């Protein structure tokens, strides 16, 4: 009977970090690929920003030109190539410049989130006011400075025009009345403009 041989488990080889001529570890290919993807995503986020929000981004001139050109192009393939170019320009930024852009984008997303929530509140309130007279009593209790007579008139007219199939003039005016009663400021309106791309332009 031949002697039993002991199986040796082969340990996986750990990847060794590459070193440059000065002895410092260089990023792995996977790390570089991941960083390039993150910058590409950041560039896409800039291209997708509303026009007014884009003006507030701390971008070097070269990046600003590349982003604006990407926004201008409508051809799918041309836009894809331009977005790749935006990514290459992004890779030329310093760490501080990239960090400043991320901070500004995070702040803009916060503004958009708050503005969107506010628009949804106005829309829900309008639906409630049109559905029930009790909703107006509750609204006036929470917003005592609102013009009661104007609110009642707008609600009555909005209901009537809906029944008659007329254009929603008073429906839109009721939106503005609720927004004003809720204490909308100039900054609220600016935020709503940035967040309202998917809302009725007449209501923003």
Curated annotation (Swiss-Prot):
Family label: Belongs to the DarP family.
Signal peptide positions on this chain: none
Main localisation: cytoplasm
GO MF terms, alphabetically ordered: ribosome binding; rRNA binding
GO biological process: assembly of large subunit precursor of preribosome
Function text: Member of a network of 50S ribosomal subunit biogenesis factors which assembles along the 30S-50S interface, preventing incorrect 23S rRNA structures from forming. Promotes peptidyl transferase center (PTC) maturation.
Record's subcellular location: Cytoplasm
Domain of life: Bacteria
Annotated InterPro entries: DarP, DarP_sf
Ranges of biased composition (kind: Acidic residues): 186-204
Protein name as it appears in the record: Dual-action ribosomal maturation protein DarP
Region Disordered, annotated ranges: 1-31, 182-204
Pfam families found in the cross-reference section: DarP
GO cellular component terms given for this protein: cytosol
Gene name in the database record: darP
Presence of the UniProt keyword Hydrolase in the record: no
